[in-house]
Amino acid sequence: MSKITLIGTDLAKAGMEFTFVGPLSGKCDECSLRNVCFNLEKGRHYRILNVRENINPCFIYNKNKVSTIEVEEATSTFNVQYSRRIMEGSSIELKSMECDYLTCPNIETCNLIHIKEPRKIVIKKILGRIECPKGYDMRKIES
């Protein structure tokens, strides 16, 4: 089921995916459109299905304009430490690895800074093993 929300006009392109991080400024509390802007769940990954013609003013985004868009929750991929419970169809509690290996190419999918923890997910697919420079047995999963 799709939802209606707002995004900066320069980002409003059908097919684009983003992770909703919540309000970007305290000024958003004063805006009459805040309920439309923030009706998504923080930390969830969304795909833009359709960009509507409606354009509204916004003092946060560049160009000071936001477009009305239809979104659906997109498939998300995460890296998790392997255990017996990591199998397709199982429900797990997603937690950040809080890794400090800053040059690792997987740090963003291991350190889940945009995810409200803990979050339960269902593993749709195990995409494979991830090479971890710290030696952890990691798997890339799709939920």
From Swiss-Prot:
Disulfide bonds: none annotated. InterPro entries: UPF0179. PANTHER family: UPF0179 PROTEIN MJ1627 (PTHR40699:SF1). Belongs to the UPF0179 family. This is UPF0179 protein PTO0851. It comes from Picrophilus torridus (strain ATCC 700027 / DSM 9790 / JCM 10055 / NBRC 100828 / KAW 2/3).
